[in-house]
Amino acid sequence: MFVAVRAGKSACRRVSGEAVRVAVDGVVGVVGAPLVSGESAAAGAGGSGGGAPAPPRLPRVPGFAARRADGSVKARGKALRERVPRDAHAEFVPDPARPDAVGAVEESGRGRIPALTPLRVGRMAANPFAFLRGSAGLMGYDLARTPMTRITAQLCGDAHAANFGLYGDARGGLVVDLNDFDETVPGPWEWDLKRLAVSLVLAGRVAGAGEDACRAAALDAVGAYRRTMRLLARLPALDAWNAIADEELVSHTDAHDLLGTLERVSAKARANTSGRFAARSTEATADGGRRFVDAPPVLRRIGDAEAGAVAAALEQYLTTVSEDRLPLLARYAVHDVAFRVVGTGSVGTRSYVVLLLDHRSEPLILQVKEARPSALLPHLATAGFDVPPVAHEGRRVVLGQKRMQVVSDILLGWTTVEGRAFQVRQFRNRKGSVDPAALAPDQLDDYGRMTGALLARAHAHSADPRLIAGYCGKNTELDEAVATFAVAYADRTEKDHAELVTAVRAGRIPAEEGV
């Protein structure tokens, strides 16, 4: 199911028949206040005649809403405008104690594999959009000092424009959604939305779009978020929950200029499978199996001890996947493990690929990726949000992903390798993505609307859409404010990127560029 998100368009929707379960403790609202109040409100009949209302037949059940709320949730959201006017979101004044860009990059590299630091720096130095992708923590520092309603949702934590893409569902279809959750954590919904808007401005500038087109993409992304949240607030709870993001989303977001690009990406995604990766990255062994082949610096073989530790950790992984998936995994044998570099912000973390083969020697590739503490955690604390302890970082990533996506990888899980937390997922699951920095201006605007709508749907799984919709309202005041912020923060990011490039050229920080 999805919706039309351009003003004046009639709403369309498509409902999937399957809901995704999430933990009820992931539903959060205004910090320090319940989403639904009024537990003592009378619920039964017989309260007429001026006497005391009859007590409800059943008590309030923990984990469920109260039968009747005092006042409107949407009205409570609207009332927040008095404390945080919507136009206040245009503000961006860099803190005098803000870390310099090079220092922030160096700090974010602590705990990563030192030999891969030059590769990570080189990727971030490629352009300002790439710098933004690798600096979620630095932006978190800045966002912690911006106006906030204090409505919380499960955040992606790194909702830049390149973190949306296509992937396969269990039935062979393609889903369009957020697809990376390394930084996921409950936090203020505005942070994800502002990061998306900034990234669209930077992607447009890298692509050579004019300033008006870049700002329009950010503006329309926020508008799509606002209108989608408003519609979700009006739907029955189950329909809103099951709002699905699939290949038909483009027609519902009026993103027709993006059709050709999405069709090409979809065709590539359908061919992006474990089988194809194994055909290019493995070779036959004497015992009839297969093993990975070296392709440095991205893919490299590892020693027996390291490979054995990763393989042994899969036993713990099996305890974290849904029990109905165990018979499927039991049909595969573990053949090999290799190290594979991924992403921009993730470069330097430990990431492995595991080759599994079934009885026909058909491959399934699992990714075992290190899960580090979210880069947003210290900044949430600075902003005054409660930051509960995390028992396992891999579990945090997996549960955050399931809370935000309508359809998630059926093999998601987590494990521990030599004391480090990891997440486990399918490596090639018909994944595809649009490069926002390669889009024409009219396509970038469409892409902004599509991703804004997707982000609203993802947030509505954990925050009450009525609360956010009440705050956002019907007019474009919030859209204009966040677009103004996005342009200002994009300017700051360009300066940060220039500082990094200068440091690389001066030899202050090593970089391996073009890889």
Name the predicted role of every residue range.
Residues 251-263:
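Plant regulatory low-complexity segments
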Residues 261-346, 355-357, 363:
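Acidic catalytic cores of enzymes that act on phosphate-bearing nucleotides/polynucleotides
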Residues 45-50:
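Intrinsically disordered, low-complexity regions enriched in glycine and serine
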